[in-house]
């Protein structure tokens, strides 16, 4: 019998970001699912505060190179990957210099939300789904964790509804 395929899309995953309730869930929930003999792919944004060298992120050339258009502007999509050795789990990172190379995750140093967080969420959601398409991987369940992932279900229901890879995908959303 084939393993159930689960796409886990998270706003934060520990140890790549500081330990918070959200990042800890983002870290251990996918591992627990994988330990139950499910096939899981985890995605998160590649925020500027993530140290690529220390966390051993590297670009996946065959998945990178797409452009995503938002408001008539082209934005290059880079896909990076790293492993959490203790959990035997890979994490894919959606990267773009314009949207994610900032020290703050969602807010600036004064605690104000970035004015383009909506575009960042659009880019992230579309980047995840386009990458999954490029992988030719058909998830049975898509679990979205955190508000920056909230557009993924909308895209699945509307923009990707005719795509056979997502035809049978069910969605779970948690915050």
Positions of PLM-derived features:
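Catalytic cores of nucleotide-sugar-dependent glycosyltransferases that transfer UDP/GDP/TDP-activated
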Residues: 1-175
């Amino acid at each position: 019998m084939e393993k159930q395929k689960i796409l886990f899309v998270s706003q934060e995953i520990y140890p790549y970001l500081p330990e918070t309730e959200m990042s800890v869930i983002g870290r251990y929930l996918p591992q627990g699912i994988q330990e139950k003999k499910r096939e899981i792919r985890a995605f998160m944004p590649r925020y500027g505060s993530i140290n690529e060298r220390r966390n051993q992120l590297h670009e996946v050339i065959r998945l990178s190179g797409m452009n995503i258009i938002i408001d008539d502007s082209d934005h290059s999509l880079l896909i990076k990957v790293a492993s959490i050795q203790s959990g035997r789990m890979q994490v894919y990172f959606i990267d773009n210099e314009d949207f994610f190379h900032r020290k703050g995750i969602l807010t600036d140093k004064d605690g104000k939300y970035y004015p383009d967080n909506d575009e960042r969420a659009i880019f992230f959601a579309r980047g995840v789904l386009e990458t999954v398409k490029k992988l030719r991987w058909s998830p049975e369940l898509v679990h979205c964790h955190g508000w920056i992932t909230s557009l993924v279900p909308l895209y699945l229901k509307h923009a990707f509804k005719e795509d056979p890879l997502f035809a049978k995908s069910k969605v779970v959303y948690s915050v």
